[in-house]
């Protein structure tokens, strides 16, 4: 029986580090990239007698997330100890939430192949992050433990098994990431581990009512790896079933170098963690007034912003989706459009440059919009140079690349690099006459109906003028000279 006769069933558990200045239960910094164990104290080191104190900002960010995702905010929630042993967990337990999480229900809506899909949520709960094992830190191959991350606040967002393909899982995660970034609760950086995703994957024969045995997949720090891991795991489980072998419930690790999953440990059930209420923390009471205040402060969310871009600015669903995928990029786009001009034509121009050339440059450098030397005003100035015929499209790309690298003003770059177009009809006409005289055969073919040769002539004229001829003037003169 081929894999097409099976249905893959996926649920995701997304761990999002919250953008607080300090950890969830102590005052240590959450800043990424410090020397190992620089941001630690008796609380996050798990020393005897050290007591946790809840960071209020964590509760507010959890409520903010829950409201944006349509969850029920529980007026009373409780922290619990999740007991397990691992070197990066100094207390021997993780403070999390179990029976009474802060948020329940909710959903995430995403678009795939032009259709909207919705995945329901089970819950959102608060918890502390663990530390990080660092291997081969010495010549003898010894491993170390960096506890800077221990105690960094997380929300875990748990979906129901509503996803039915690797592509759906990727689009769900993209939509959720965009929401978290728009809320300002998470930076969306999967490479640094501030947004992590585990996938629960099972397969069942199409038409069956009972779900198959699930395996949890870890170590996926990109959308590409999430897709690869789910697709491999689904194939692996189908092959086991077809061979008459059982699928064992377990936790598996994705190996990005080999593009496959491998067994990590047997999958634990809740009772294996011996959850019990955290005795050192009181219940979390969330008052209705706080919920309503946070509800009133919610920003425009990505789907609403994308719909506004399409409705008010005439952008395509594709362009709007690309812009709202990153809240910082969409805010930059709004500022650039305000600097350049209003209307659908202006919006399309700005969107093309933001999602095209600027996105390419940003991907090469890894810079966020806040660090771009191309400010919204500088992009607007570049586009005005194009509108005025001072530079063409290729010249504008050169200008933006230089501005992105140096922060120079666009008009100064045009002058320094000699990028200004020639619009003088006399100069262009001389080049046109020279090209037509050098290619009489092609000119006759054009006049005989081979109209596609116009591009050839334009290219030859631009070559003659070293790329500086105004394309509109070049085209007009060629058509006139060729008898159009």
Curated annotation (Swiss-Prot):
Q: Write down the Pfam families for this protein, in alphabetical order.
A: GatB_N, GatB_Yqey
Q: Which GO terms describe its biological process?
A: glutaminyl-tRNAGln biosynthesis via transamidation; translation
The record's catalysed reaction(s) read: L-glutamyl-tRNA(Gln) + L-glutamine + ATP + H2O = L-glutaminyl-tRNA(Gln) + L-glutamate + ADP + phosphate + H(+); L-aspartyl-tRNA(Asn) + L-glutamine + ATP + H2O = L-asparaginyl-tRNA(Asn) + L-glutamate + ADP + phosphate + 2 H(+)
What keywords are annotated for this sequence in UniProt? Answer: ATP-binding, Ligase, Nucleotide-binding, Protein biosynthesis
Stored InterPro entries:
Asn/Gln-tRNA_amidoTrfase_suB/E, Asn/Gln-tRNA_Trfase_suB/E_cat, Asn/Gln_amidotransferase, Asn/Gln_tRNA_amidoTrase-B-like, GatB, GatB_C_1, GatB_Yqey_C_2, Gln-tRNA_amidoTrfase_suB_CS
Per the UniProt entry, the Enzyme Commission number(s) are 6.3.5.-
Q: What broad class of enzyme is this?
A: ligase
Q: Which GO terms describe its molecular function?
A: asparaginyl-tRNA synthase (glutamine-hydrolyzing) activity; ATP binding; glutaminyl-tRNA synthase (glutamine-hydrolyzing) activity
**Could you confirm whether the keyword Nucleotide-binding appears in this record?**
yes
So where does this one cross the membrane?
A: none
- Which protein family is named in the record? Belongs to the GatB/GatE family. GatB subfamily.
Functionally, this protein is described as follows:
Allows the formation of correctly charged Asn-tRNA(Asn) or Gln-tRNA(Gln) through the transamidation of misacylated Asp-tRNA(Asn) or Glu-tRNA(Gln) in organisms which lack either or both of asparaginyl-tRNA or glutaminyl-tRNA synthetases. The reaction takes place in the presence of glutamine and ATP through an activated phospho-Asp-tRNA(Asn) or phospho-Glu-tRNA(Gln).
Q: How does it assemble?
A: Heterotrimer of A, B and C subunits.
Record's protein name: Aspartyl/glutamyl-tRNA(Asn/Gln) amidotransferase subunit B
What organism, scientifically named, is this protein from? Anaeromyxobacter sp. (strain K)
């Amino acid at each position: 029986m081929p894999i097409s006769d099976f249905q893959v069933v996926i649920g995701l558990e997304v761990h999002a580090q919250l953008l607080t200045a300090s950890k969830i239960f102590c005052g240590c910094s959450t800043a990424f990239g410090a020397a190992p164990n620089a941001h630690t104290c008796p609380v996050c080191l798990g020393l005897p007698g050290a007591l946790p104190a809840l960071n209020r900002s964590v509760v507010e960010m959890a409520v903010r997330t829950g409201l944006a995702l349509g969850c029920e905010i529980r007026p009373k929630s409780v922290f619990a100890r999740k007991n397990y042993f691992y070197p990066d967990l100094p207390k021997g337990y993780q403070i999390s939430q179990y029976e009474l999480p802060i948020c329940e229900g909710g959903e995430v809506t995403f678009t795939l192949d032009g259709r909207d899909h919705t995945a329901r949520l089970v819950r959102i709960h608060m918890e502390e992050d663990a530390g990080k094992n660092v291997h081969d830190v010495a010549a003898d191959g010894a491993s170390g433990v960096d506890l800077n991350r221990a105690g960094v606040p997380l929300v875990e967002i748990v979906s129901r098994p509503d996803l039915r393909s690797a592509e759906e899982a990727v689009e769900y995660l993209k939509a959720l990431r965009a929401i978290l970034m728009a809320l300002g609760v998470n930076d969306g950086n999967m490479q640094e581990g501030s947004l992590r995703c585990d996938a629960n994957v099972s397969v069942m024969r199409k038409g069956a009512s009972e779900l198959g045995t699930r395996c949890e997949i870890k170590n996926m720090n990109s959308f590409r790896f999430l897709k690869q891991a789910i697709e491999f795991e689904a194939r692996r489980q189908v092959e086991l079933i077809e061979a008459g072998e059982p699928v064992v419930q377990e936790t598996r690790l994705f190996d990005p170098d080999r593009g496959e999953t491998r067994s990590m440990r047997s999958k634990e059930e809740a009772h294996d963690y011996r959850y019990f209420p955290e005795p050192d923390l009181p219940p979390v009471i969330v008052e209705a007034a706080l919920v309503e205040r946070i509800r009133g402060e919610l920003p425009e969310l990505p789907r609403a912003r994308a719909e506004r871009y399409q409705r008010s600015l005439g952008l395509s669903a594709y362009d709007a989706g690309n812009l709202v995928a990153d809240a910082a990029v969409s805010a930059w786009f709004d500022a650039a459009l305000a600097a350049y001009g209003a209307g659908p034509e202006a919006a399309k121009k700005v969107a093309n440059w933001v999602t095209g050339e600027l996105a390419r440059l940003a991907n090469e450098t890894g810079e966020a919009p806040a660090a771009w030397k191309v400010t919204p005003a500088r992009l607007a100035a570049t586009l005005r140079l194009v509108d005025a015929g001072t530079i063409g499209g290729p010249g504008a790309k050169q200008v933006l690349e230089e501005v992105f690298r140096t922060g120079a003003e666009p008009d100064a770059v045009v002058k320094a690099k000699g990028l200004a177009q020639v619009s003088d009809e006399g100069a262009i006409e001389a080049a046109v006459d020279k090209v037509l005289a050098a290619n009489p055969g092609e000119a006759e073919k054009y006049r005989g109906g081979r109209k596609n040769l116009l591009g050839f002539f334009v290219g030859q004229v631009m070559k003659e003028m070293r790329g500086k001829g105004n394309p509109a003037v070049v085209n007009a003169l060629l058509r006139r000279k060729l008898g159009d």
